[in-house]
Amino acid sequence: MPPLTDPERSRCYLNALANWRYDGFIVFMKDAVRWLRAELPDPSLRELGRLLYEHVEANGCTCVDEQIETREGWRDRHPFHHDIRMPVAGRLIYFETRLIYRDPGDPDDPLIQVVNAHDA
């Protein structure tokens, strides 16, 4: 799977993750929340945001897979989705995310939606 190497999207992705302490920058959507609460009741969603940030910060955005969105119903709204596989609580977890931004020059503009999570 191709890594996230585009400089603008990489910067925006890391900027969104860097704001993990604040509401609205990493948004866990209902399907991801449902699985995470059932399978990994600890850590909290905020803690998962911190772990995602630390993982990408330590390994660079090339640890994030960038997929061209081809699925019906999504490809018209999102050109890409981004996948992260990382250890959490002794398990390898897959996170499917969407990067949303309008102003790549504003570090507080981008946000990430975590739309799915499951064992990798």
Q: Can you name each region flagged by the protein language model?
A:
Residues 114-120:
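Short, solvent-exposed aromatic-acidic interface loops
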Residues 57-111:
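Functional cores of ribonucleases/endoribonucleases
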Residues 1-78:
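Compact soluble domain cores
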